[in-house]
Amino acid sequence: MAPLLLQLAVLGAALAAAALVLISIVAFTTATKMPALHRHEEEKFFLNAKGQKETLPSIWDSPTKQLSVVVPSYNEEKRLPVMMDEALSYLEKRQKRDPAFTYEVIVVDDGSKDQTSKVAFKYCQKYGSDKVRVITLVKNRGKGGAIRMGIFSSRGEKILMADADGATKFPDVEKLEKGLNDLQPWPNQMAIACGSRAHLEKESIAQRSYFRTLLMYGFHFLVWFLCVKGIRDTQCGFKLFTREAASRTFSSLHVERWAFDVELLYIAQFFKIPIAEIAVNWTEIEGSKLVPFWSWLQMGKDLLFIRLRYLTGAWRLEQTRKMN
């Protein structure tokens, strides 16, 4: 009996090793090059409040605002107004309290099929294009790609990415700012503060099925085991960057869709950029574009491939690249 068990164990180990080698080969051979940092001609401009074209700035220009808010939006004509109303109400009140405070909100329409750009442009007309700008992408790039386009067109010393659904209470940006400041001194002026829902985990578990809870824990384990250490919630769409940290991480990003957050933080940890994880107020909003099982499965595959592609040298981290 013992020899049979030993043989089965050896066979199992051999099959596992063969599977890992095969997956590594697939990861290496299917690895796409880093997406070209290229804008279509139409994406080099925004419309001012009068509907006239103006050239977008670059993240490699000197900052002229204290805060940039980048809002990736795909078919968000219904949910975007709630988020924009809350954000702009807060930002306007803050500016009245402190006239030295300056900001901009950049809505990036990621190839939407609805009226997202028109809805966003109404805020540009109301507040002016110095405060609200709309970038309409020619085709869908994915959430990470849309955020990158917004960040590379920003003017802020600090840059916040915030989801269009308004799930995170916008005034919590102050918590992220404090978290960022607590990380000082910043090496090479780079630091990141991540909004986190980890403190809400017990409450969310009580509302989820056992299967979804199992998927959640499995995903968290894979993130920790394969890519990012010490960050409990990598997926919250509320993150604050110094300008230098944003340019370094987003110029090195390969993944432009759902698992981009994980690669982003993997890159940050590779470059030893300090990261703070800050609890924020978060509410689940109806209309999610994720199908739970398949989205977790896809992201699990992405995590494995992210790790293997860096390990095998298919992907390499480079110095900061500029967009054409």
Swiss-Prot record:
Bilayer topology: Single-pass membrane protein
InterPro entries from the UniProt entry: DPG_synthase, Glyco_trans_2-like, Nucleotide-diphossugar_trans
Key words of the record: Disease variant, Endoplasmic reticulum, Glycosyltransferase, Membrane, Signal-anchor, Transferase, Transmembrane, Transmembrane helix
Catalytic activity: a di-trans,poly-cis-dolichyl phosphate + UDP-alpha-D-glucose = a di-trans,poly-cis-dolichyl beta-D-glucosyl phosphate + UDP
Tissue expression pattern: Expressed in pancreas, placenta, liver, heart, brain, kidney, skeletal muscle, and lung.
Enzyme Commission code: 2.4.1.117
Cytoplasmic side: 29-324
Chain coiled-coil ranges: none
Name of the protein described by the UniProt record: Dolichyl-phosphate beta-glucosyltransferase
Source lineage: Eukaryota, Metazoa, Chordata, Craniata, Vertebrata
Name of encoding gene: ALG5
